[in-house]
Amino acid sequence: MGRYRGPRLRIIRRLGDLPLFTKKKPHIASKRLPLGHPVRKIKRRPSIYGLRLLAKQRCCYSYGLRDYQLKNYIKKARNAQGDPIKNLIFLLESRLDSKIYRSGIVSTMAAARQLITHGHVLVDNIKITIPSYSCNESQILDYKNTKLTSELIEKIKLSFNPIYVLEYYAIKL
């Protein structure tokens, strides 16, 4: 079993906006029911189980995880010292595909996974092809010198705006 490869807009309509999953947005007209379908009834308030299930599904689809992978990350987060939720976020954000996505080279987590599995990413000058590889802060991420990666890096250089960086750090302080 691999990651989800089905229709993405169907998931977006069900779970809401998932920026890590895809950049696609559903059309406003697609919210209507097709002809011949009965009118929707009033939705009931979701149960606690339903809310937790939605949160789990949003997390799984956002980071491209399967249920057992998320379960293992939750176990690790609970066993570590400190707040389990912060530990879980730290574990998910320390994955290699998440680091590549946050660097701004690619637009979605799936594109980051593809870049890694095709062998374009080096960690401490070693080719890593596993998207779930856990990175430390001290490790150096690099890209193979190919036409694809050089085009991606040029695109980032053109879209870089230092004013946004200054605003970000001014708000954080």
Swiss-Prot record:
Q: Which GO terms describe its cellular component?
A: plastid; small ribosomal subunit
Q: What main location does UniProt list? A: plastid
Per the record, a Pfam family? S4
Location comes to: Plastid
Task: Give GO terms: molecular function aspect only.
Answer: rRNA binding; structural constituent of ribosome
The GO annotation for biological process reads: ribosomal small subunit biogenesis
Q: Which family does it belong to?
A: Belongs to the universal ribosomal protein uS4 family.
Subunit and interaction comment: Part of the 30S ribosomal subunit. Contacts protein S5. The interaction surface between S4 and S5 is involved in control of translational fidelity.
By its UniProt entry, which PANTHER family does this protein fall under?
A: 30S 40S RIBOSOMAL PROTEIN, SMALL RIBOSOMAL SUBUNIT PROTEIN US4M
Q: What is this protein called?
A: Small ribosomal subunit protein uS4c
Q: Please give the organism.
A: Helicosporidium sp. subsp. Simulium jonesii (Green alga)
Lineage runs: Eukaryota, Viridiplantae, Chlorophyta, core chlorophytes, Trebouxiophyceae
State which gene encodes it: rps4
